């Protein structure tokens, strides 16, 4: 009669596990635990490395939903602004969305008003997205005339044409090629155009762009050049706390990005 052959007892290498049939055999459990801890360690290290190499995105502040009043005298040209009574720099005015405020302040030049809106600010430059305007004084009650412009300098500047609303804080980042389509629409809608310039020391300035006669720029012209590196010459002055460049678009020169 043949002798029955007894199978060898199972070893640790023979462990087999089906995911829906617990418990997990100890040898497999040990391997899984090690793999999980290794994955966690790699993940934490990757997050720390990415965070350490992250560069902060420059931008301003948009106080969305915080409607507050600002009083002052309306300036219609070249771009709508409010000159505060306390002598602080003028606050540029814009409408909601991608629209300038020219239709909202038409006929209110030198009128003292109270404007309710949402503040937009960056590096000391302020803007207000208008919610409502209430006239609270007659022309005769308004504060004195506009502060005189500072020294006029003949300059040649290099920088990028930006829409001031997004750049000052409505969008972060509000500059660069990824923002070009949005900026073009804002400029066509009447948002004041500006030139963002940086000097060799890394100091940056926002310069409002106006025509040689000191009037608002043609929206179509600046919209077509949104966020293009551009060289432009003109007369630079300081007015109402803002840098302003009178320049002829016909003399502008595109620069290689």
Task: Give the role of each language-model region.
Residues 2-257:
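OB-fold and OB-like single-stranded nucleic-acid-recognition modules
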